[in-house]
A protein has these predicted regions:
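Short, ordered loop/turn segments at secondary-structure junctions
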Residues: 13-14, 42, 76-77, 112-117
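Proline-centered loop/turn at the N-terminus of a beta-strand
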Residues: 6, 70, 104-108
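C-terminal binding/interaction regions
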Residues: 85, 90-154
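Electropositive phosphate-/nucleotide-binding environments in soluble metabolic enzymes
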Residues: 16, 20, 24, 42-46, ...
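N-terminal beta-loop-helix "entrance" segment that forms/cooperates
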Residues: 39-55
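Short, well-ordered secondary-structure micro-motifs
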Residues: 20-21, 49-53, 82-86, 119-123
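Glycine-rich phosphate-binding loop
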Residues: 51-95
Length: 154
């Protein structure tokens, strides 16, 4: 085990092909920056905040010598015929923001909220909009902010 910074990538697998593209973009950015990463899979977007909360509790409980420096949450919600889309998008986004602000975590937000599959595919594609890479870059930048305020070792 090394002591290089680690990022936990939590991926909602409901749209597995979209998740794979998001993660590929993130892993490329993290590898380029020299960050180790670990992947954790959850069923859907609604489960992302709980998984991050569990990881935080585990770090407290086990006093890890190499805790996660940051987290990236990936998933996709595509509008359907009911208001389920609105509830999942709103509640998962709110819960992630609450976790980030209450626990001062570096979080890359990589949840795609799309009207249709074509939008999701173009945003997730590494050779397209590469939203996975963007979420990883956001996480890395927030780690720098934490370092600035001495909330994480340099």
């Amino acid at each position: 085990m090394t002591d290089s910074p680690r990022i936990l990538i939590i991926e909602a697998r409901f749209y597995s092909d979209i998740a794979d593209q998001l993660v590929a973009g993130a892993m490329s950015a993290l590898d380029s920056a020299g960050f180790e990463h670990e992947r954790l899979k959850v069923p859907g977007v609604f489960e992302l905040p709980a998984a991050i909360c569990m990881a935080l509790r585990s770090m407290e409980f086990h006093s890890s010598s190499n805790p996660y420096a940051g987290f990236i949450a990936f998933g996709c919600v595509i509008r359907g015929e009911t208001d389920h889309y609105d509830h999942v998008c709103r509640e998962s986004s709110r819960a992630l923001m609450d976790l980030a602000t209450k626990n001062a975590i570096a979080l890359g937000f990589g949840i795609l909220t799309c009207e249709d599959r074509a939008q999701a595919e173009s945003r997730a594609a590494v050779d397209g909009k590469n939203k996975g890479g963007e979420a990883a870059e956001a996480c890395l930048r927030m780690i720098e902010v934490k370092r600035h305020f001495r909330l994480i070792e340099r």
